[in-house]
Amino acid sequence: MAFTGKYEIESEKNYDEFMKRLALPSDAIDKARNLKIISEVKQDGQNFTWSQQYPGGHSITNTFTIGKECDIETIGGKKFKATVQMEGGKVVVNSPNYHHTAEIVDGKLVEVSTVGGVTYERVSKKLA
């Protein structure tokens, strides 16, 4: 299923524990809790531009092609190289320290990230 669209966070699971695992400061974790982050995805075949826009103007954008190595930036600001794959309709990022999947389920963007044995799930509703 095509990923293109603009999505707003609707629900999160295990936010605090995951953000602590990323070694984010407690004040940043508290400040970001319940923010309405907008994810904008542009898909052109195997090419993706995946942006997250935070209130206050901060954003992160990752551009990648399925099957090719790229640089990925996490919500914690860390950067690493990974080869993004498409597996069963899911976008999959796998590295030694980070695992992330994203898929469209009932029109919603469902993302699951795991770091150091801690899993975080975010569900976003489609805006456009």
From Swiss-Prot:
PTM sites of type N-acetylalanine: A2
Source organism per UniProt: Sus scrofa
Compartment(s) where it occurs, according to its Swiss-Prot or TrEMBL record: Cytoplasm; Membrane
Free-text note on domains in this protein's UniProt record: Forms a beta-barrel structure that accommodates the hydrophobic ligand in its interior. Can bind at least two ligands per molecule, however, the stoichiometry is debated.
Membrane-topology descriptor: Peripheral membrane protein
Keywords of the record: Acetylation, Cytoplasm, Lipid transport, Lipid-binding, Membrane, Transport
Free-text function comment from the UniProt entry: Binds to bile acids and is involved in enterohepatic bile acid metabolism. Required for efficient apical to basolateral transport of conjugated bile acids in ileal enterocytes. Stimulates gastric acid and pepsinogen secretion.
Gene name, Swiss-Prot/TrEMBL: FABP6
PROSITE patterns with a match to the protein in the record: FABP
CDD domains (UniProt xref): FABP6
GO biological process: fatty acid transport
Protein name per Swiss-Prot or TrEMBL: Gastrotropin
Expression (tissue specificity): Found exclusively in the ileum and to a lesser extent in distal jejunum.
Family statement: Belongs to the calycin superfamily. Fatty-acid binding protein (FABP) family.
Main localization, broad class: cytoplasm
GO CC annotations on file: cytosol; membrane; nucleus
GO molecular-function term, one example from the UniProt record: fatty acid binding
Pfam families for the chain: Lipocalin_7
